[in-house]
Amino acid sequence: MLRFFLACTLLFPCLANAGSDINPASCQRIAMGPGPDDMHLQSLAVPRLIISSHDRRHFRNHGNLYALPLDSLKAGIMARTGEPDGFTLRPHGLDLTQRDGRWWLYVINHDKELFSDQHTLVIYEVVGDTLIFQQELHSPLLTAPNDVAVADNGDIYVTNEREDGASIAEFLFLQRKANVVVYRPQLGWRIAADDLAVANGILIQGNTVWITQTLGEGLRRYQRTSDGRLTQMAQLGNLSLLDSITVRDNGHFLIPAYPSLPNFLLHWQLPGQRSPTKIYDVDPQTGQGSVIFADSGRTISAVSTALAIKDQLYLGQIFDAFVLRCPLPQ
């Protein structure tokens, strides 16, 4: 996500503002920790969001995982138990799954340095308001992980923004080396797909896998093979500068984008500077999208996740310390 921006800031023009279905002035801020980048709905008697939080302006700081009940809208840090000595959590992308009545949370966990190849994937069981540590997966293939998604058979897919997480050259020259890796307990980690331009969001629907790219154009669609590899790639549409991907009730996708990379960089370094954002409603049949939310950055900057729940839209972001809740026209 944010790792590539320094290199590409001067290479892309700012995109023009577009109209939207949602008036940002109608939205409500919900306070929590900095950088609530990713979120997933846990469907309980009282539904709640589980949200990753990390201060990416001070990357070495530890982060937290929050629970946000949708009735009270009061976020709280989730307790964590069983973590090994010396463990530090700097969460990024998440996936939340339910199997046999038990909930499992998969968390991209970053090293203390922005440019590093020492990242991991952490698995917790969610029991009430507590996260019980289960496993931390290490691999040299977790080079610059961004997002994670788990298939029905337990295969774990992770998007990497770069092939070499410690490579500044790959960053500066915008080399098309990003990939998706897959983990299966019997086989370990392997590359599932490559030749991506900053692989970002990932969504699995049965044997179909969707990938967003931040530098590459269009939404990518793949088919899973029996060994977990991704084949039959199709590129749909021409949207670019994309982040995560979620599904609406109508089957369309919600995908945030960054209209101005120079403003994003300024916002990263100077909190008072604003960074515009857009949310696309994307037809998965064509990859074409319409803007349902656009903001100059005055209401929220650098949205990274958009999640629709009934008639409300919840927006996470990369840096600032709140989630935005907006009425969603039906």
Language-model regions, residue ranges each:
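A short helix->beta-strand "capping" segment at the edge of beta-propeller domains
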Residues: 19-35, 75-79, 287-295
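Short, conserved, GDST-rich strand-edge loop motifs in beta-rich repeat architectures
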Residues: 51-61, 107-115, 158-176, 255-274
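Beta-rich, blade/repeat-based domains predominating
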Residues: 33-46, 61, 83-98, 139-156, ...
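Beta-propeller blade signature
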Residues: 63-71, 118-127, 173-185, 273-285
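Loop/turn-rich, solvent-exposed surfaces of beta-rich toroidal or solenoidal domains
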Residues: 238-291
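Asp-box/WD-like beta-propeller blade repeats and closely related beta-sheet repeat scaffolds
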Residues: 86-92, 103-152, 162-166
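Blade-level signature of beta-propeller repeat domains, shared across WD40, Kelch, NHL, RCC1
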Residues: 302-330
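Blade-loop segments of beta-propeller domains
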Residues: 63-99, 105-111
